[in-house]
């Protein structure tokens, strides 16, 4: 069975655990519609991605 050679210091343990925290998702304001969207994702209202029309927008009922 693997056994650590040295005791892990509280600093090292904390640095390892710092990546476990949940981070709030980031949003950017869309230049065309002004709505918030995730970066590197398609704007579902307009169907635009990086200045190109990639989806046909749904008709609002």
From Swiss-Prot:
Keywords of the record: Ribonucleoprotein, Ribosomal protein
GO BP term, pick one: translation
Keyword Ribosomal protein: yes
Pfam families: Ribosomal_L32p
Region listing for Disordered, in residue ranges: 1-61
Any one GO molecular function term: structural constituent of ribosome
GO annotations of cellular component type: large ribosomal subunit
Segments of skewed composition (Basic residues): 1-16
Biased composition, class Basic and acidic residues, residue ranges: 28-44
UniProt cross-references to InterPro entries, sorted A to Z: Ribosomal_bL32 (IPR002677), Ribosomal_bL32_bact (IPR044957), Ribosomal_zn-bd (IPR011332)
PANTHER family named among the record's database cross-references: 50S RIBOSOMAL PROTEIN L32, LARGE RIBOSOMAL SUBUNIT PROTEIN BL32
Family: Belongs to the bacterial ribosomal protein bL32 family.
Name of the protein in question: Large ribosomal subunit protein bL32
Organism: Rhizobium leguminosarum bv. trifolii (strain WSM2304)
Gene: rpmF
């Amino acid at each position: 069975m693997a056994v650590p050679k040295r005791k892990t210091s509280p600093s090292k343990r904390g640095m390892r655990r710092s990546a476990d925290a949940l981070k709030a998702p980031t949003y950017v304001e869309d230049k065309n519609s002004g709505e918030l969207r995730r970066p590197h994702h398609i704007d579902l209202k307009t169907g635009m991605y990086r200045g190109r029309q990639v989806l046909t927008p749904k008709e609002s009922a």
